[in-house]
């Protein structure tokens, strides 16, 4: 294939011109991807549907060349390439890839992922069978890249941010979904928040669940997350991004008239509860290093929710402790899964008051009272 990297980037044209619209656009953010991109591209070839998909490599200003690894696939897959103006954030790289997408369905893969053979055929068949118009989600495997051993099967788990397929016309374009370019982390969670709001507007609260394993997620350190910060401190270090991608995303969509107030309220209070458990866990594990500014971010978010949604601390607590405290417990479990040990040192209501007092007096429910209500 007599094409060079700069020609592909400059023109945005595919290495192979398809005579019809591809079913899938697979967007792959790349950065110094030479060690892993071969396995990923070969796994796409092994889907045996190369005439029905396009691959978009979106490079985030790599400092190490890897085009020699891509070149052998230029006559096997319809490959497009693009490059960001400067190295900044993962959302910016993904957004650049979306601009070139022409497929009916979008999906995103990290450069060290590997698709399981022929799984995209099953995804396509199931989407068509059930005539899904918006969003589909499948399972994935967490794999040790050194041994190839499966560490866990991510199947109908709390983590719905991965193995998702988005309809380009009915969902992505219709609801004007874009990555938030200034997020250094949690860009996938932000997209999930936007998609959830769009599905709510479309009266389709749940994506189509496809019970198959779609790809292997290689559980290795990356320059963006664990290599630099570790699993635990990563969330603490980028807590502001977490709030931007979750709570703020929902409340902003309510302000734009895209979702009802109750849906935004549910999301906002869920984020506050998770933040409560997160912050207590951080302080318990390492009180000296805990980032004090995270409390400032949380205080700003709580005040924002009160101003936009008309919430009070009493209402937030009552909402969280309602229905046998199932909502409260759900967030506690999610937090424990995310950061490990959860050791609350104060009640949720006291924590809310610590962040921001309501003007009017109210009664504080103690931990023992909460336990009684839970019964």
Regions found by a protein language model. Give the residues of each.
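Short beta-strand/loop segment that forms part of the nucleotide-sugar
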Residues: 52-61, 80-84
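Conserved nucleotide-sugar donor-binding catalytic segment
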Residues: 153-234
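A conserved acidic beta->alpha catalytic loop
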Residues: 59-68, 86, 110
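Short aromatic/hydrophobic "clamp" motif used to bind/position activated sugar donors
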Residues: 106
